[in-house]
């Protein structure tokens, strides 16, 4: 599990120029629809890169690249202070252009919540 703190959200806001109050203004957000600030959906999605190597082991490669994503959904917001983790399922593996393409469905779970924060099919390519 990893905690999403306000400094991470603020850093993402700076990096992406998305300073919407639901993300960066704890005082205003306290009376908003979520009762606190929330992580950007794309911040949650970006953390898939942290979770993926924890979920699948890829050996004997010289390089791995992100090829894309399919079916990205954000069913539930991640409130600042919440803890999240990734769960993965390999959907497919196929040979492509001298390497392998692997599709993994990642579900970003929120501790003590029924609905996930994000569900995405990540597409990675690995080369020997």
Give names to the regions the model predicted.
Residues 1-39, 56, 127-128:
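Catalytic strand-loop segment that frames the active site of acyl-thioester-processing enzymes
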Residues 77-128:
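HotDog/MaoC-like acyl-thioester-processing domains
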Residues 10-13, 45-49:
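Predominant activation on well-ordered alpha-helical scaffold segments within soluble catalytic domains
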Residues 32-39, 46-87:
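Hydrophobic beta-strand-centered segment that forms part of the acyl-chain substrate-binding groove
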Residues 8, 23, 58-64, 79-80, ...:
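Intrinsically disordered, low-complexity segments enriched in polar/charged residues with Gly/Pro
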């Amino acid at each position: 599990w990893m905690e999403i703190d306000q400094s991470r959200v603020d850093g993402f806001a700076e990096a992406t120029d998305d300073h919407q109050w639901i993300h960066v203004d704890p005082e205003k957000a306290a009376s908003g629809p979520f009762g606190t600030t929330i992580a950007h959906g794309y911040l949650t999605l970006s953390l898939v890169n942290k979770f993926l190597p924890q979920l699948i082991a890829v050996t004997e490669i010289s390089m791995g690249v992100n090829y894309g994503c399919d079916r990205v959904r954000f069913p539930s917001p991640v409130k600042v202070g919440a803890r999240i983790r990734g769960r993965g399922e390999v959907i497919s593996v196929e040979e492509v252009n001298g390497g392998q393409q692997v599709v993994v469905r990642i579900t970003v779970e929120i501790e003590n919540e029924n609905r996930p924060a994000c569900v995405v099919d990540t597409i990675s390519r690995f080369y020997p």
